[in-house]
Amino acid sequence: LLWLSEQQGVFNFLRRNSLARRFASRFVAGETSETATAAALDLKRLGITTSLDLLGESVTRDAEAIGARDEYLRMLDRLAASGAEINVSVKLTQMGFDIDEALCVDNMRRILTKARELGGFVRLDMEGSAYTQRTLDFFERHLLAEFSKHTGVVIQSCLRRSADDVTRLIGMGARVRLCKGAYLESPEVAFPDKQDVDRQYVALMEQ
């Protein structure tokens, strides 16, 4: 589930555009972290697992990355206090990955330390294919050993490389979540045919 929080440009567009608002309502749990938490709690009562994701990526300033980090820290506390599942998904570019890797490491470690204290889980979202290897390297180098019980990574079944990635991650004992992928990629990198994406999704799931 997504929540909008302080992503003001996106927030204003969705508020003004009724078509965009109807489309987004399928995926956006709430306009604030409070409403997103309530949605997550409702789904937990139905036996449905959730992971909350703050809408936004590719920040360009340290302050934006730190602000997103602090919003995640507040969300983890809010989820714990509410009784909802303590599970969030984070994009590295939102944590300053393209600004300064040390900043990104610090932000992610703070989020994961909080999640570990609360018995929660942090999923590393996968972005476009230009970030796939960098994200996996970051996950292995900075997070997996210390936070293995509280973190995992996403793999996209649309990418041709994903079978090898899943095999390697399983060998490391990493927790993998599969998705089909929503980024526009070249046919050299990703399967252009949905049937191939679906077929690989099933094959990866069975590994």
What is the meaning of each model-derived region?
Residues 1-207:
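Positively charged, amphipathic and often flexible ligand-engagement surfaces
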